[in-house]
Amino acid sequence: MAGPRPVVLSGPSGAGKSTLLKKLFQEHSSIFGFSVSHTTRNPRPGEEDGKDYYFVTREMMQRDIAAGDFIEHAEFSGNLYGTSKEAVRAVQAMNRICVLDVDLQGVRSIKKTDLCPIYIFVQPPSLDVLEQRLRLRNTETEESLAKRLAAARTDMESSKEPGLFDLVIINDDLDKAYATLKQALSEEIKKAQGTGHA
């Protein structure tokens, strides 16, 4: 595909992916485009349909997955999450670098497609730090917190697999982590800027 490559960002919940992405989008709002994921979970307070997620029924999502309309999907805590081909195409149609925020299962699914993105894993300095960050959010029950930490431990182990990620960023200092992320994407940012973006 011509133009800048998409970016796949992965990492455990609480590693700081959303914060890093927010900074990236603030600095380069005309260059990056978020691929909006689908989910069958209920919206959290303040979340908007079509902006944070496409909130859909399980029946609708299962039908579209069966039809091959998703490049990746996964189930977590009883809810389906996934990225549709259409969501990625919508970003590419605007000539932007498409950002996909997916879990490890999603990364493996995307590896089987012809998307050819840059794969980046964001991880916390330790599981203890991750637990503190998740507790500060105050959105988890003890049970869901334990599940997230177990998943994070597995993800952090898997991120060491050779060839799975192009870059692993340890987010112990937000500014440093952001500088590393920007450096990794500098070539693609230049490409996107060269296509008439400010």
From Swiss-Prot:
What the record says about family reads: Belongs to the guanylate kinase family.
Note whether Cell membrane occurs among the keywords: no
Q: Which InterPro entries match?
A: GK/Ca_channel_bsu, Guanylate_kin-like_dom, Guanylate_kinase, Guanylate_kinase_CS, P-loop_NTPase
The encoding gene is: Guk1
Could you provide one GO biological process annotation from this protein's UniProt record? Answer: dGDP biosynthetic process
Quaternary structure note: Monomer. Interacts with RD3.
Question: In UniProt terms, what function does this protein have?
Answer: Catalyzes the phosphorylation of GMP to GDP. Essential enzyme for recycling GMP and indirectly, cyclic GMP (cGMP). Involved in the cGMP metabolism in photoreceptors.
| Binding-site residues for substrate, renumbered to this chain | 37-51
What are the positions of the active site? 44, 137, 148
PROSITE patterns referenced in this protein's UniProt entry, alphabetically = GUANYLATE_KINASE_1, GUANYLATE_KINASE_2
The UniProt keywords, alphabetically, are: ATP-binding, Cytoplasm, Kinase, Mitochondrion, Nucleotide-binding, Transferase
Which reactions are catalysed by this chain? GMP + ATP = GDP + ADP
Q: What is its EC number?
A: 2.7.4.8
Q: Where is the Guanylate kinase-like domain?
A: 4-186
Q: Which SMART domains match?
A: GuKc
Q: What's a Gene Ontology MF term here?
A: ATP binding
Subcellular localization is given as: Photoreceptor inner segment; Cytoplasm, Cytosol
So which tissues is this one expressed in? Widely expressed. In retina is expressed in inner segment, outer nuclear layer, outer plexiform layer, inner plexiform layer, and ganglion cell layer (at protein level).
Q: Main localization of the protein?
A: other
Protein known as: Guanylate kinase
- Binding sites annotated in the UniProt record for ATP: 14-19, 171-172
* Gene Ontology cellular-component terms listed: cytosol; mitochondrion; photoreceptor inner segment
Q: Which organism is it from?
A: Mus musculus
